[in-house]
Amino acid sequence: MKYVVVSGGVISGIGKGVLASSTGMLLKTLGLKVTSIKIDPYMNLDAGTMSPLEHGECFVLNDGGETDLDLGNYERYLGVTLTKDHNITTGKVYSHVMAKERKGDYLGKTVQVVPHLTNAIQDWLERVARIPVDDSGMEPDVCIIELGGTVGDIESAPFVEALRQFQFRVGRDNFALIHVSLVPVIHGEQKTKPTQAAIKDLRSLGLTPDMIACRCSEELDKPTIEKIAMFCHVGPEQVVNVHDVASTYHVPLLLLEQRMIDYLGQRLKLSDIKLGAEDKERGARLLDRWRHLTTAIDESFEVVQIALVGKYTHLKDSYLSVIKALEHSSMRCKRKLEIVWVEASDLEPEMSASDKEKFQQAWKSLSSSDGILVPGGFGTRGTEGMILAAKWARENKIPYLGVCLGLQVATIEFARHVLGIADATSSEFYPEVAEDKQVVVYMPEIDKQNMGGTMRLGLRPTIFQEDTDWSIIRKLYGSASSVEERHRHRYEINPKMVQKLEEHGLKFVGRDETGTRCEILELVDHPYYVATQYHPEYMSKVLDPSQPFLGLVAAAANILPSLLAAERAVGARADF
């Protein structure tokens, strides 16, 4: 097993996740099997109870793990399926060590950070790195380990020490370190001092970088590269220029041009790993498809505007998987994506009284967009604005996709304005509302006391109902009888309301195995009005877009019929 560690210095949020994912993708183009682990040095057990505005989105895995958003990057770039154990947090490791102490596994010894915690971290890395993550079912060849935060922070100290020990545990030929640093441009001059200081801190902790990935707003000058190499005690070929590009999907090719994989191949002796001809051919095909993808991005000029009506729009990372799913779909449709951010509460009548200009701008943005997306969320704030957005899409035949909460507000809107239930709402918004007004109800099996890990989580099947051959979303799924998607919710459509809703044209074309829990709704006689209780964005891949999102973008671009025809003729992974 080969290990490539990606750490960061100077500042957080520097792009370690994209660089780690891109490195893994390039290793896959050699035919290698690649996995990934993310270390998050916070005390939370997982990301499930953290505010999206605090930490970005919570990414959900097949096994129901609520993890850091970087695991989404790994899955999208590498085409793998990770587990909750691929996300290590300080809280998880401490819980693991304390559980062993309570069982007496340490035989009465004083339990300390070194060696007990650091050994637990190393054991975790070795165990999880060997878990098969792709369709081959075989143990991976290479594991990418991303250390979150910034080296030198007190929170990451135990993990840095564990990695220092780990390099000797696995051997030099099996361990490489890429350190990501910032090269700011001040008054037109590229400054190397922050990188020099970051590498000095790293070396003082016992870790030596094999490569330094320099993030900069512009391409690094040759003298800058030579200066970093000289003062950081590495060769110029070990300094990688990761400047800003038009799209993050260009980053793997940017690294390839600088022969990063050639260096890692020599450093880790990757040629010793025995690969079959089929593995190498698969890797070559992956690289060809990626080149084709980036070319399609550069040649996409026709714009499609999607209004994203959310309640966490002040931090775009709150909707990272949604953004990526839209990007994947727009690339398939050969369109240039423009996301129009609309804060849901700005659409509500109360905003007209408090800030008329903001209210008018929100409605102008919504009404001028080609398609409308209402993503997931929790709580009451902004939900009336989402309901109004769903109403606008329904009445004006604008392509609409609702996800999780987006399905619930679409159903409430339909109940209010088509069924005539004026006070229709959700028991999440108004717990004391009369039962005949509850369009959305709390799922009976869900724990109401504890918040962490108590939702309906992970990969679950959705069964398409009889007489749904007309359904656009079913056609997008290749007319399948069932699909499996990832869930994260506590509330569901009230089963007692379903018959009346369907009688008026709101069809629940997909349900769970019992046939009672509604998973997909679709409006009859509408260009594209679809909503899902599950989160399809979590399974969207760069080269294999999520079907509900693909339908939204294609409908918004007025190419849905031709897309469906192409998908039927060539297959779901065809380059349309």
Curated annotation (Swiss-Prot):
> What pathway does the annotation place this protein in?
Pyrimidine metabolism; CTP biosynthesis via de novo pathway; CTP from UDP: step 2/2
GO terms classed as biological process:
'de novo' CTP biosynthetic process; CTP biosynthetic process; pyrimidine nucleobase biosynthetic process
Superkingdom field: Eukaryota
Any single Pfam family the record assigns to this protein: CTP_synth_N
Instruction: Provide the top EC class.
Output: ligase
Task: State which Enzyme Commission number(s) the record gives.
Answer: 6.3.4.2
Which InterPro entries would you find in this protein's record?
Class_I_gatase-like, CTP_synthase, CTP_synthase_N, GATASE, GATase1_CTP_Synthase, P-loop_NTPase
- UniProt cross-references to NCBIfam families, sorted A to Z: PRK05380.1 (NF003792), PyrG (TIGR00337)
What functional role does this protein have?
Answer: Catalyzes the ATP-dependent amination of UTP to CTP with either L-glutamine or ammonia as the source of nitrogen.
State the similarity comment: Belongs to the CTP synthase family.
What is the name listed in the Swiss-Prot or TrEMBL entry for this protein? CTP synthase
State the organism named in the record.
Answer: Eremothecium gossypii (strain ATCC 10895 / CBS 109.51 / FGSC 9923 / NRRL Y-1056) (Yeast)
What broad taxonomic lineage does this protein's source fall under? Eukaryota, Fungi, Dikarya, Ascomycota, Saccharomycotina
| GN (gene name) | URA7
